[in-house]
């Protein structure tokens, strides 16, 4: 094999190894697998809470949401389960089913949902609504994820900024929907 071909192949291998090392380092940083965000809404907290509890209202502000299936119809507290069917626009519009189970619940204030997509990720998301007085409230969402395989874990520095952007868009949509009613 000609020497220049060997050099090109070695350079490509070195770039791949370096890229993998950088992604590995970035994905292992504290907080790399977490998302946090909040938005102030010029409506009372009860109005915001309805957009977390009522499936049609929830679908109206969570982007990519196509369907919500109640696994425990009528139940909203600890142990209630839903399946969110999402059209993942970062994956060519493929449908993804996210299983969720409420593991902590304070009506009108907060709920924590354990979520999973088998073979892809698991996580927990806390949704909270804080009364700021004067008919204003703050909605917050804090999530932590664990990816199911090494390749996906390696892509954390690419996946999480995209998820963060979507989360911010969703929160702005929530603000607009609640304030418009």
Task: Identify the residue ranges that each predicted region occupies.
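Short, well-ordered beta-strand segments in beta-rich or mixed alpha/beta enzyme
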Residues: 52, 141-142
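Solvent-exposed, acidic/flexible segments
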Residues: 41, 45, 51, 92-96, ...
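Hydrophobic ligand-binding cavity/cleft-lining segments
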Residues: 4-72
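A conserved amphipathic terminal alpha-helix motif
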Residues: 3-22, 138, 144-181
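Glycine-rich portal/gate segments that line the openings of hydrophobic small-molecule binding cavities
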Residues: 5, 9-12, 40, 70-119, ...
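Surface-exposed coil/turn segments at beta-strand junctions on protein surfaces, enriched
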Residues: 30, 132-134
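Extracytoplasmic/secreted envelope proteins and their assembly/folding machinery
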Residues: 45, 49-55, 62-65, 79, ...
């Amino acid at each position: 094999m000609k020497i220049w071909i060997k050099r090109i192949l070695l350079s490509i291998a070195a770039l791949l190894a370096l890229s993998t090392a950088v992604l590995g380092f970035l994905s292992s940083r504290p907080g790399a697998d977490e998302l946090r965000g909040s938005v102030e809404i010029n409506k009372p907290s009860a109005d915001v809470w309805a957009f977390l509890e009522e499936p049609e209202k929830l679908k109206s502000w969570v982007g990519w949401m196509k369907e919500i299936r109640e696994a425990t119809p009528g139940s909203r507290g600890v142990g209630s389960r839903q399946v969110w069917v999402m059209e993942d626009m970062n994956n060519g519009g493929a449908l993804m089913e996210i299983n969720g189970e409420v593991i902590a619940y304070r009506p009108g204030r907060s709920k924590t949902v354990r979520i999973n997509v088998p073979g892809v990720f698991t996580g927990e998301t806390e949704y909270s609504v804080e009364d700021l007085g004067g008919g204003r409230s703050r909605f917050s969402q804090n999530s932590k994820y664990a990816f199911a395989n090494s390749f996906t874990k390696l892509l954390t520095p690419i996946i999480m900024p995209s998820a963060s952007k979507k989360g911010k868009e969703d929160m702005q949509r929530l603000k607009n929907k609640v304030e418009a009613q």
